[in-house]
């Protein structure tokens, strides 16, 4: 008697089923984004704390913008990337009036998943770093899935 054990296969979401050519995306591609920190970007205004310095969610938003700048313009028509994972540390405060600069470098391609190494700096020092993952989706298929979720 022979037994064969197989792990259950993860079901691929429908918006990821079609194969697309991402060969024009290359490891090492970089994007960046900048922001002048204003009162509207502080933790009290965002709702993430009480100290009037750059809010972590704003830094993360800038990191995602840097990742978009690296690759979004190279994606095939009808496709875009969506953020699916962040592992970021925010380790230095930035006051209102100071400029911040975020960078994202594409370090790995795994099918439709794009993995970035990310960093953020203010005018004086590094303020955050980590990794960020995005997945490339067919926008029409993704929108259909969202409409089904809404019951439309």
What are these regions (language model features)?
Residues 61-65, 69:
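Short, residue-level hotspots on alpha-helical faces of the histone-fold
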Residues 26-32, 85, 99-101, 113-115, ...:
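Intrinsic-disorder/low-complexity, polar/charged segments enriched in Ser/Thr/Lys/Arg/Asp/Glu/Gln
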Residues 20-54:
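Catalytic strand-loop segment that frames the active site of acyl-thioester-processing enzymes
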Residues 128, 133-152:
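C-terminal output/interaction extensions
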Residues 88-123:
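Hydrophobic beta-sheet segments that form the core/acyl-binding groove
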Residues 68-101:
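Hydrophobic beta-strand-centered segment that forms part of the acyl-chain substrate-binding groove
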